């Protein structure tokens, strides 16, 4: 059913203004952002498609379907959104902007009160920071002696190897922040979080180098859309 065919008090925008945002379903809130549908597909249907469970095309191996709810959508990139029919460049840009604001708000809250004392806390924070990036990034969380966040820096971009990530630079940044410990992190835009041999070798190199200045490596987290892996939990540290 098109929005115009709904009773006035049931249309998402009017419902939000009259009753508050908490009364709206996720699809209704998205419909307000999207504003209009396309021929043969109403805006509510388009919004629901974004929230539908994801799938995989058996022939191509490419992702299909939606993003599995708001949490999954939070990590979607502009390129990911292209698979939803009817989402043109303008709608994709608006949606990505809103999602980025949401990620920044969540990350700020975590940063202001964060004590990274469990792998889950670290993974959650890093997913907000790295999962939606379309290129590979190597980042470091610099922590004090109580595992509180001092800073996060993206130090290198591109395919990560022992030759593209410079241990000296990581050490200099750790000393600059007076860090007692670090968490290493990088993303795999391809979607796999399994560590490669290069990931393991790089981790050991950085761990040995940072130990020379009494900085502990607590973990190396690999992030992909919708998932994250802790190398510490896997016993690879």
Curated annotation (Swiss-Prot):
The entry sums up its family as follows: Belongs to the UPF0758 family.
Q: Can the keyword Magnesium be found in this entry's annotation?
A: no
Q: What terms describe the molecular function in GO for this protein?
A: metal ion binding; metallopeptidase activity
- According to the UniProt record, which cysteines are disulfide-bonded? none
Motif annotated as JAMM motif, chain positions: 186-199
GO biological process annotation, one example: proteolysis
Name of the protein described by the UniProt record: UPF0758 protein Veis_1654
Task: Please indicate which superkingdom the organism of origin belongs to.
Answer: Bacteria
Positions with a binding annotation for Zn(2+):
186, 188, 199
Ordered alphabetically, the record's keywords are: Hydrolase, Metal-binding, Metalloprotease, Protease, Zinc
> What is any Pfam family matched here?
RadC
Q: Where is the MPN domain?
A: 115-237
């Amino acid at each position: 059913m098109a929005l115009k065919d709904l009773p006035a008090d049931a249309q998402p925008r009017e419902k939000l203004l009259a009753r508050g945002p908490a009364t709206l379903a996720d699809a209704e809130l998205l419909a307000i952002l999207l504003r209009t549908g396309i021929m043969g597909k109403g805006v509510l249907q388009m919004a629901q498609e974004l929230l539908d469970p994801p799938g995989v095309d058996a022939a191509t191996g490419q992702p299909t379907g939606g993003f599995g709810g708001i949490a999954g959508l939070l990590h979607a990139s502009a390129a990911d959104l292209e698979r939803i029919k009817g989402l043109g460049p303008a709608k994709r840009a608006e949606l990505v902007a809103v999602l980025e604001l949401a990620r920044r708000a969540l990350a700020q809250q975590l940063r202001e009160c964060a004590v990274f004392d469990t792998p889950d806390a670290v993974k959650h924070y890093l997913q907000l920071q790295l999962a939606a990036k379309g290129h590979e990034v190597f980042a470091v969380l610099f922590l004090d002696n109580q595992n509180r966040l001092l800073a996060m820096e993206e130090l290198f971009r591109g395919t990560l190897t022992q030759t593209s990530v410079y241990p000296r630079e990581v050490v200099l940044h750790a000393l600059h922040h007076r860090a007692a410990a670090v968490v290493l992190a990088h993303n795999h835009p391809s979607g796999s979080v399994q560590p490669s041999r290069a990931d393991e070798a790089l981790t050991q190199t950085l761990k040995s180098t940072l130990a020379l200045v009494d900085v502990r490596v607590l973990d190396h987290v690999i992030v992909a859309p919708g998932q994250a892996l802790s190398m510490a939990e896997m016993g690879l540290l």
